[in-house]
Amino acid sequence: MYLYPMVEDLQINQGSKAEIYQSLIPQITALIYGEADLVANLANVSAALKEQFNWLWVGFYLVKEDELVLGPFQGPVACTRIKKGRGVCGTAWQDAKTLIVDDVEKFPGHIACSSLSRSEIVVPIIRNGEVIGVLDVDSEAPGHFDDTDKKFLEEIVAGVIFEFLPRRT
């Protein structure tokens, strides 16, 4: 068994977007390895992504009954609850698929939590075929997110966070 070292500071990297993600994923894994607390892990993942990419907002919403409820995040204050099918987060939850929105003002039913947000990517967190939350990332730049972000954020959610979420019984 490989033991991950404690990460006290992120190694901020330069290079292509893919290279930055490839460098960041092992650091995120080291941050959360061995920690069973969901809030602590999601908080550290949010902080790592925000610190590396300097996006406007990075955070999680978790499914509680019939709505998404704000979880750990980094950035300006945010909407606390989102109904299924509403806005980008609620639509990604409803459709159980990643959504990239180049211009949030053109997204039907967009929920404007911050007037500074111009583009957004939302990645559902799926366990046993059920969406249990979403990773939401906002940028101040229109058209900021692309297939590279989709690929690596899905990898972070599925391959890193997924392993450390508490098992529901």
PLM ranges: what are they?
Residues I126-S139:
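Sensory-domain boundary capping and coupling elements
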Residues L56, V63, E67-S115:
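Regulatory sensory and allosteric helical modules in signal-transduction proteins
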Residues S119-I126:
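A short, aliphatic-rich beta-strand micro-motif
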Residues A47, E155-A158:
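Generic recognition of well-ordered alpha-helical segments
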Residues V7-N13, D138-I156, E163-R168:
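Regulatory loop-to-helix N-cap segments in sensory/regulatory domains
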Residues W57, V122, V134:
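Short hydrophobic/aromatic beta-strand element in the GNAT-like acyltransferase core
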Residues Y2-P72, E163-T169:
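Intrinsically disordered, low-complexity terminal regulatory regions
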